[in-house]
Each structure stands twice: as C-alpha cells, then as structure tokens.
Amino acid sequence: PPYADSPNVTANGGTAGGRRHRARRKADKPRQERELMLRCMYHTVPGRVLLKMLSGRRFSALCGRFMDSSLSRPLIRRFVRKNHIDLNEYTATRYRSFNDCFTRRIRAEMRPIPHNPRALIAPCDGRLSAYRISDGLVMPIKQSWYSVSDLLGGDPIAEAYRNGVCLVFRLCVDNYHRYCYIDNGTKGRNVFLPGQLHTVRPIALSRIPVFIRNCREYTVMDTAAFGPVTQIEVGALLVGKILNHDAEARVHRGAEKGMFLYGGSTIVLLLREGAADLPDALFEK
C-alpha cells in the first residue's frame, strides 16, 4: 500500500508506535510482577507469614544447599538463555551446579586493568550510583534505606567519611559476580553483620511497617592511591551469600577479593573527602 514506506507504519499495517508500546509493555511485565509480589509479601497477612518463612535461616540454608548441588544444573540453561550470557567470555562453559555457573570466572582479557595507578577502578560489574556523604544521606539498597552508619552497623569509623564519597554498585543477575580490590595496599579484618527483619506490631495485623537490614560484610583497606577506603558487600536478607577470600593481608589492585553466591548483589565503596577526583555528572541529585 502507498503508506507502507511511512516511518510510523509497519508493512503489515500496524503502527511502529504501537509496536514500540507493546514492546515496552512486554519489557515492563517482569518488573510489574516483581512489584506486585513485593506488595503482597509486605502488605498482606499471608505475605507476611511467607516472608517470615522465606527469610529464616533454615530455609535459606536449604536453598543454598540445593543451589550448590547437581540437582540445580537444569536451571543453568534457562538462566543463561534468559539473561543473554555469553559463556565464551568465561574460563569454563560446563558447570557442576547453579552456583558454580553463577560464580563463573571471567577471562582476564575481558576486564583489563588500566595502567594509570591514580585511575579509580570499579570493584565489580554493575550499575553505579554516586553520593556525596552528608549527615542526612540515606541510600536505597535492596528494598531498604541506609545511612553510612547503618551500613557499618554503627561503627564510629563512619565519621571518617563525612563529606567524602559513597559509590554504590548494584549488580544485575546477568553480571559477573566476582569482585576485586581497587588498589594495592593492606586490608583489615572482615566484619560480618547479620541481616535483621523488624516489625513494629504483631504479624496478625493487616499492614505492618517492616524494617529490613540485609547481611553485610565490610573491611577497611589502607590503599596506596586513595588512602583509607571501606568496602562493603551486601548480601541476602538473613543468611550471607558473600564469600571473601582473605583475612588481614596485603592486597593487589585487580586481584579477586571475593564473590557473591545467588542472593548477594551490591557493593559499596566509601572514600574520604578529596581521595578521588570524580566528575560532578556522576553524582545523583
């Protein structure tokens, strides 16, 4: 037909705008389903009961054992296909379990380290949010809100980062889930903070405010280029899915620091004022 060459009309007679709208609706569907599930779990009595069960240590441990076992292997093919993961970028293409696939090791040439020692490298793959640290700063991390002090469990060291920078790296499920040291230096001990689920009224009531604290693990590093830096890994609700390799040790830029198993997916870096020269465009308003 004469209108088929129009940029807004497809050859089968449908409008390109309508086609894009349907594509957006299809892309938004998983997000809408997740939001509906969260509303049900946080704001209904059955959902609250289920949340208590799912956030329990026994259930999380059982899930962890399943993900580590060969019984979870059938999940791998769908996971790889759904998330468009190119296994050729990794050192192995066959895996013993789902967690073995989830923590797959990437080829070194896929993540080259810049030669400039003053270049601040990302500790992991992910989407970055940057914040200037002030007294009123609270950040959304994994369905909860944290101040810097909250993230560190009230550790007084938080005060050292006043007017500094907080970098939050949110890993997506298809990202590489191992992470590295950002610089040469020494690291202190790993401090683990267990997750907590607080409700302010009995679970029998229909709507109950919930306060969640995910499990975290943090360490302070004395780095060559950026001075004292604190790195925080954020895991699942109650049971940690964080595996750090080293206790107190000398560390090297780009060397693997640890990895997330399924359920852990955020890294936070705290830098002191003036430690790194970052562009203003990087920071959220």
What do these predicted regions represent?
Residues 2-3, 12-285:
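Contiguous, well-folded functional domains in the mature portion of proteins
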